[in-house]
Amino acid sequence: MQIHKLCIFVLFISLLSSKTISAVKFNFNRFDGTNLIFIGYAELGPATDGMSRSGALSMTRDNIPFSHGQGLYTDPIPFKSSNNTSSSVYSFKTSFTFSITPRRSNPNPGHGIAFIVVPTVAYEYDQDSTRGFLGLVNLTTNGNPNNHLFAVEFDVFQDKRFGDINDNHVGVNINSVNSKVSEKAGYWIQTRTRGKNQWLFKEVKLSSGDNYKAWIEYKNSKVIVWLAPAHLKKPKRPLIETQVDLSEVVLETMYTGFSGSMGRGVERHDIWSWSFENTAKNN
């Protein structure tokens, strides 16, 4: 009888230990450094007085040319049930407000920011990841499938080496800074002309210093991206909608956050708010 009870107890403990919480949901209305990992030159952004903090997560420092950095959520996040490439990827969605602000004494922008999903926390600062590499990869690692990198870039410098369509675009990247698909930055609004509904595209300038909001969703092997000025609601029509199978890209757990870099064209890259949610269930 005692042995029977012991077996039941061991089984109960085993079941408890195997049950893990996979779903993740968080929201930052502003940043104070809590639950964040800072890599490279990433920091809590300074306020205009130069002493206090603005509440932003900053990827670069406008007084340091060629600076770049990453700001990541502290905990690894489940992205699929196992590392097997056949495992389906959990749906996820994220939204954030950001601004890219050139330094007044040097109005030429460069280079941009990206929402990222990466396999590890890269504590070793890579000096070669600056400029058009957006703090993500370097000339040697760009395009390597072992990067296990997913990113949506907001690029304000046309680097023809990477096939950039212009100096003001949004792109979806897999293991590389060469975008799988990209569109000029802007948003769609629906208008009515002569009794007919029509879509009108309104371009925005990412490096204007204005606040913009982005929404990114992944579901059923499809990436969907919306962009609009921060004071507007999410547009009904997305900027980008493309088929992307992340099952061979993401691992069972990944880190998520932002990266950014600049060259001689000094600018600030600030994230002002951020929410993230995946649809994983308890295992």
UniProtKB/Swiss-Prot annotation:
Residues 1-23 form the signal peptide. It comes from the Eukaryota. It holds the Pfam family Lectin_legB. The keyword Plastid does not apply. GO terms for cellular component: apoplast; nucleus. It is found in: Secreted, Extracellular space, Apoplast. Residues 24-277 are annotated as: Legume-lectin like. Keywords: Apoplast, Glycoprotein, Lectin, Phosphoprotein, Secreted, Signal. GO terms for molecular function: carbohydrate binding. InterPro entries: ConA-like_dom_sf, L-lectin, Legume_lectin_dom, Leguminous_Lectin. Glycans are attached at N84, N138. The modification Phosphoserine is found at S247. Gene3D superfamilies: 2.60.120.200. PANTHER family: (RAPE) HYPOTHETICAL PROTEIN, CONCANAVALIN A-LIKE LECTIN FAMILY PROTEIN. Belongs to the leguminous lectin family. This is Lectin-like protein At1g53080.
